[in-house]
Swiss-Prot record:
Protein name: ATP-dependent helicase/nuclease subunit A
Keyword DNA damage found: yes
Catalytic reactions of this protein: Couples ATP hydrolysis with the unwinding of duplex DNA by translocating in the 3'-5' direction; ATP + H2O = ADP + phosphate + H(+)
Species for this entry: Streptococcus sanguinis (strain SK36)
This protein's UniProt keywords: ATP-binding, DNA damage, DNA repair, DNA-binding, Exonuclease, Helicase, Hydrolase, Isomerase, Nuclease, Nucleotide-binding
Top-level taxon in the UniProt lineage: Bacteria
Family annotation (HAMAP family): AddA
Binding positions (ATP): A47, S48, A49, G50, S51, G52, K53, T54
Length: 1224
């Protein structure tokens, strides 16, 4: 199809004016139109929540296709596989509609081709695309195309641990052993456990995987902080802050003495304040660092007089309330200022100490870099040996291919008309490098919202988006910036609440983006612009004594939601459901973590509210039914394992009680007192135990049955797969059926079924055997890892419980954000190593410091841990980035709501009101306050307090225990579907009669519609070929008639009784088809090109040797072969198709699926060709055999493109000479 020019700026403006003047109920915004039709340069679309970014992407793609761009000429990267599938579905629907409306044959043909090509279009995650690149071009790096993905974190950890041990041993035995010991002890201290050091190595490795070039980052950036430490600049920076703090204190003291201080005239503290002002008077702009330091020390010394109360205003008990309040306000405002100055004094002392010792740690940091580099290389080599890679490896291989081989890079750059990416704010540097390499510099289209960048833990870097946003905003020649801020999802009340919070919370200093008019959410849906007071956002704070049973849990675990918060939420859900008729499916609970939500599940079950929790929690191996099966397998592997054997005996499979096990434990033999439980079991069976009288006849039978069952399983395990063994256990003891009768039976059965599948997948890898499988599971558990739980079908009308991360991109009518008082996770800030993309590594260094002491018993050397200067700088960067991401998490959570938003926390009104939230600065909370706050709740409460004179769009209400009694909470008003006495009224005879009637009717239907029942819903051309063949289908064999039976036949091979399997015709056929697909068609292929293509074929060497390349070469000398070369842009190879057919016997329709070897697509005709490797003597036999199959292919092509002229060719490669036969 001939290309249609893209719209000019003037034409886009006209389109915008026409849309604005139209009477459509829902119009496109001017910004949406601009994003759909703009072209000719890089475009960044900043799309706020609910602004219709997916709609814009779909419409832009459709517009480009309607202008003649093929879907195969678009690269579209999505954040998830699910998003890619949804995008394809939308495009399929839009293309189908466009095809119906198309009038010109040329456009119809073009659109039909795009529909056919859509399943194979490059629409997917960057990981899926890099896999394609590596499969196709991995041979350039010496990599096999049949690699597998190491997706399991547990499997990765096992390999990492093995490689780490090898590299560690190498370094420990090297000439740098002394320095290496110092490095290890720096992180492990006196502990012999290496886990602390190993953990830091793995953290650095994980960070490396997100860089575009790990080796280059290690070489150029890793040591940057230590090689460029500027203590003078750091002092200058600190002293600038000190001067500001001192002047702030001077202003505060002066104002105090001038105004409210008069009420305290003559008080002792005022003399100290006056002395401080005298000292502060010596500070000016020209004061040197030394002078400023001296003034700081004097102020700190003054503040420490009177036991640190020198500046404290005191009033007597009998003073009036106003005076008490004035003293309180003064003291609370003064306290943080003095504390800040004291911290500066300490900071200067520490800086001097660090400067003396930091150079000592440089050799350690260099050695750490070398160790990580060697570990990364050794780990990569191990993965190459396994032919299994992580996604990061595959991305780096793809980048290496595109950077190293210009011809490959040009291929992709010339192929793609546009490089599009969704969720651009969550891009990491590896992905950004890939996008750069695929684009031509001015053909990128990027969509995202920096306010929704919440995947820093996956190494996403919102700075990539932010830098482009600023660059395009300041200089349009670099690219076009389009901002979509109209929200079509939410009601006005949700948007106003979100704006009211974030315009007072988020700016570039704390938040990494200035939330101003550019980013304010605007209601775009006319139906949702009308105010509705009932939808006003609610900030509900539970103030009571109901706690979570896990309140005193480990510090490392997420903070659990309190019982009172859950009751509060349940009460409101019951009200919504009973009074407003809100369906459960319209309600969603959001939490920061998917763990420790058991209290929520139990409470909802108690109140009979259906709840579907977020899937994917890694607790599969902790489920009871899986634990029982693992102990069963451990016992089969090694019966001498007392723990596993005891667990198996006590399990429901054998049901031994405590008394029976106690009797068994007393059956040690006469000769040995210390025996395993299994040996005691054998003794009991043979009557050789010390206390045979304790073994009753019933217990004897039970033990005998157990012993025989166990032995049968052990015997079976030696000759069968793990999968078969597991299912034998399920069937022998009816364990699978039994767990299905328990609570959550479907989930339990799914877990058991998944165990068999995981065992099967395990044996497909390079690992084999029960012992190694058990060993792998045990290593996973030892490292405190687990496997993801198995999802099961959920009820349709149920409240959903999910994490904020999981909710991104989704929308729900009613949203409850729980646990607002949960403290932010700041574990990264306490790590011994902190990494920065630009500043490299920063470590905590343990220095050996000599001290002079008089006491002979005191140590003369101390080990002191210090935060090196690069560590401090990286920490400040990390804390700001973490805090900014927490703001974005809150933004994502709040913008999920369509109708009403509930923000739920826990706290004391008295305590919250006592907090000093400070004053506003330029319409926001002060930067220092925002930085110090550690949970969502305090942010919102501070906004309410500081801006109390403004009409905020959310209401705050405290809820007490009195409001959460059982009577106040209420219950769901649902009719009882199955009364308790129903079962008592049933009669068994009626049930049996009804069941027999049903079975009889089923039998009649089966007989009546047998042909339709036996008809498969999907067939392939090979399966229905017999309907078209005039003779018996013996695909791949010679067909002999009566006369041919007496002709002399070619000799045949004798049976091969060796170890090597004989090459089959099917194997050769598959290899030939793959070879024909890989041959480049840019010119007539030489033998060298054919050999290179053959090397890429995924087949055994024995199979490849059966392929005669001379025949392939001669094909390209035929008329058809030359036609393919001359029209390579029109050639389609290995094209899948699907077509609806009707079965003559049943009259039912079925889907015919297949893959075409290839065809040439012209405007008025199609040339279809098919390769056949069948042995033959007479080509007419093959033509007769495959005519029906080719007719089906031709029919499918004709339907797809609306072209009736189809030429059909068979390319016969199984004879002595190549033949290209036209089939009429």
């Amino acid at each position: 199809m001939k290309r249609i020019p893209f719209l000019t700026a003037e034409e886009i403006a006209l389109k915008q004016a026409q849309e604005a003047a139209s009477d459509k109920p829902q119009k496109k915004t001017a910004e949406q139109i601009e994003a759909i039709y703009s072209s000719g340069r890089n475009i960044l679309v900043s799309a706020s929540a609910g602004s219709g970014k997916t709609f814009v992407m779909v419409q832009r793609i459709i517009d480009q296709i309607l202008r003649g761009v093929a879907v195969s000429q678009l690269f579209i990267s999505t954040f998830t596989v699910k998003a890619a599938g949804e995008l394809k579905e939308r495009l399929e629907k839009e293309l189908g509609q466009a095809l119906k409306e198309a009038e010109s044959p040329e456009l119809k043909q073009h659109l039909a081709q795009q529909l056919a090509d859509l399943p194979n279009a490059d629409i997917g995650t960057m990981d899926s695309f890099t896999q394609k690149v590596l499969s196709r071009y991995g041979y350039l790096l010496g990599l096999a195309p049949n690699f597998r993905i190491l997706q399991s974190a547990s499997e990765q950890l096992i390999l990492q641990n093995e490689v780490f041990s090898q590299v560690f041993d190498h370094y420990y035995d090297s000439e740098r052993q002394a320095l290496f010991s110092r490095l290890v002890k720096n992180f492990t201290g006196k502990r012999k456990d290496l886990s602390a050091f190993r953990e830091q190595v793995y953290r650095i490795y994980s960070f490396l995987q997100s860089t575009s070039s790990p080796q280059r980052w290690l070489e150029e950036t890793f040591l940057y902080g230590y090689e460029h430490s500027d203590f003078a600049a750091e002092r200058e920076r600190i002293f600038c802050q000190i001067k500001s703090a001192l002047w702030e204190l001077e202003t505060f003291f002066s104002a105090h003495l001038e105004h409210e201080g008069r009420e305290f005239a003559g008080a002792k503290y005022q003399e100290n304040v006056q002395d401080a002002l005298t000292v502060l008077a010596g500070l000016n702009e020209s004061s040197s660092i030394e002078e400023t330091a001296q003034i700081l020390k004097q102020i700190v010394a003054l503040s420490q007089l009177s036991n640190g109360q020198a500046f404290t205003a005191r009033v007597g008990k009998n003073a009036d309330e106003l005076k008490k309040e004035m003293a309180k306000d003064y003291n609370e405002a003064r306290k943080p200022m003095i504390e800040r100055l004291r911290s500066f004094d300490q900071q200067l002392y520490q800086l001097d100490f660090i400067e003396q010792h930091q150079d000592e740690c440089l050799p350690l940091v260099e050695l750490l870099r070398d160790f990580v580099a060697d570990f990364a290389q050794a780990y990569l080599e191990r993965k190459k040996a396994e032919n299994a890679f992580e996604f990061g490896d595959i991305s780096h291989f793809a980048i290496e291919i595109l950077e190293t081989f210009p011809e490959v890079r040009r291929f992709y750059q010339e192929r793609y008309h546009e490089v599009m990416v969704d969720e651009y704010q969550d891009t990491n540097h590896t992905q950004e490098r890939m996008l750069d390499l695929l684009s031509r510099g001015k053909n990128r289209f990027m969509v995202g919202d920096i306010k929704q960048s919440i995947y820093r833990f996956r190494q996403a870097d919102p700075q990539i988006f932010s830098d482009k946003f600023k660059a395009y905003q300041e200089d349009s020649s670099q690219g076009k910036l389009i901002v979509l801020k109209e929200n079509f999802r939410s009601h006005l009340e949700v948007l106003e609440a979100t704006n009211d919070v974030f315009k007072r919370l988020m700016d570039e200093e704390v938040g990494e983006i200035d939330y101003n008019e550019t980013h304010y959410l605007v209601a775009g849906n006319p139906a949702k612009r009308e105010p509705n007071p009932a939808n006003r956002a609610s900030f509900l704070i539970y103030e009571g004594s109901k706690e979570s049973p896990e309140e005193e849990a480990d510090e490392g675990l997420p903070q659990a939601v309190s019982a009172g918060e859950v009751d509060l939420v349940i009460k409101e859900i019951i009200r919504l459901h009973n009074e407003e008729g809100v369906a459960f499916k319209d309600i969603t609970l959001l939490t920061a973590s998917r763990t420790r939500n058991d209290l929520i599940l139990a409470a909802f079950e108690q109140h009979q509210i259906p709840l579907v929790p977020d899937d994917g929690a890694a607790n599969y191996l902790q489920s009871v039914e899986v634990l029982v099966m693992l102990d069963t397998l451990r016992t089969i592997n090694n019966p001498l394992n007392d723990y596993a054997l005891t667990a198996l005996l006590k399990s429901p499979m054998f049901d031994f009680g405590e008394d029976e096990l106690a009797r068994l434990s007393l059956q040690a033999s006469q000769e040995r007192s210390q025996e395993n439980l299994y040996e005691k079991l054998v003794n009991a069976l043979e009557g050789r135990g010390l206390n045979p009288a304790l073994v009753t006849e019933e217990l004897q039978k039970k033990l005998q049955h157990f012993y025989e069952t166990l032995q049968s399983w052990r015997t079976y395990s030696k000759t069968h797969s793990l999968y078969d063994l597991i299912w034998k256990i399920y069937q022998d003891r009816f364990y699978y059926d039994m767990v299905g009768t328990l609570v959550n039976g479907a989930q339990r059965q799914a877990n058991l079924y998944a165990l068999s599948l995981r065992a099967n997948e395990y044996e497909k890898s390079s690992f084999k055997g029960l012992s190694r499988f058990i060993g792998m599971i045990d290593r996973i558990l030892e490292n405190q890892h687990d496997l993801a739980s198995v999802p099961v079908a959920a009820p349709k009308d149920a409240v959903r419980l999910m994490t904020i991360h999981k909710s991104k991109g989704l929308e729900f009518k009613y949203v409850f954000l729980l646990n607002m008082d949960k403290a932010f996770n700041r574990q990264d800030s306490s790590s011994a190593i902190i990494l920065s993309r630009t500043k490299g590594v920063g470590i905590k260094y343990v220095a050996d410091v000599s001290v002079s002491v008089k006491d002979s018993y005191a140590p003369n050397q101390l080990r002191i841990s210090m935060d090196t200067l690069p560590y401090q700088q990286n920490l400040a960067e990390l804390q700001l980035a973490s805090l900014s991401e927490q703001m974005r998490l809150l933004y994502v959570a709040m913008t999920r709501a369509e109708t009403k938003l509930y923000l739920v926390g826990k706290g004391s009104q008295e305590a919250l009101d006592k907090r000093q939230w400070g004053k506003s600065q330029q319409g926001r909370l002060s930067a220092s306050l925002r930085s110090q706050i550690s949970n969502f709740q305090d942010w919102l409460y501070a906004i309410q307090d500081v801006f109390s004179d403004e009409n905020l769009a959310y209401e705050t209400r405290f809820v007490t225990d009195e409001e959460l009694t059982a009577e106040e909470i209420g219950r769901i008003n649902e009719p009882v579907l199955f009364p308790a006495d129903d079962l008592a009224d049933n009669r068994q005879s009626d049930d049996i009669r009804r069941a027999l009637d049903i079975l009889e009717s089923v039998d009649r239907l089966n007989s009546q519609y047998r042909s339709a029942i036996e008809l498969p819903s999907v067939r392939t051309p090979s399966q229905i070929k017999k309907f078209y063949e005039p003779i018996m289908d013996t695909d791949g064999l010679d067909i002999m008639d009566e006369r041919a039976a007496f002709r002399p036949q070619p000799s045949f091979e004798l049976p091969d009784f060796g170890k090597k399997a004989k090459v089959t015709g099917a194997q050769v056929g598959s290899a030939v088809h793959e070879l024909m697909q890989r041959i480049p068609l840019d010119s007539s292929p030489s033998m060298a090109v054919l050999r290179s293509a053959l090397a890429q074929v995924q087949a055994d060497d024995a199979v490849k040797k059966q392929i005669q390349l001379s025949k392939i070469a001669s094909f390209f000398e035929t008329d058809l072969g030359r036609l393919l070369i001359e029209n390579s842009d029109r050639v389609r190879r290995e094209a899948p198709f699907a077509m609806l057919k009707r079965d003559e016997a049943s009259g039912q329709e079925f889907v015919l699926r297949g893959i075409l070897d290839g065809y040439l697509l012209f405007e008025d005709r199609i040339i279809l060709f098919d390769y056949k490797t069948d042995k033959y003597k007479d080509s007419s036999e093959l033509i007769a055999r495959y005519r029906g199959q080719l007719d089906l292919y031709a029919q499918a092509l004709s339907r797809s493109y609306g072209i009736s002229q189809i030429e059909k060719y068979l390319i016969l490669l199984g004879g002595e000479q190549l033949q290209v036969v036209k089939v009429d």
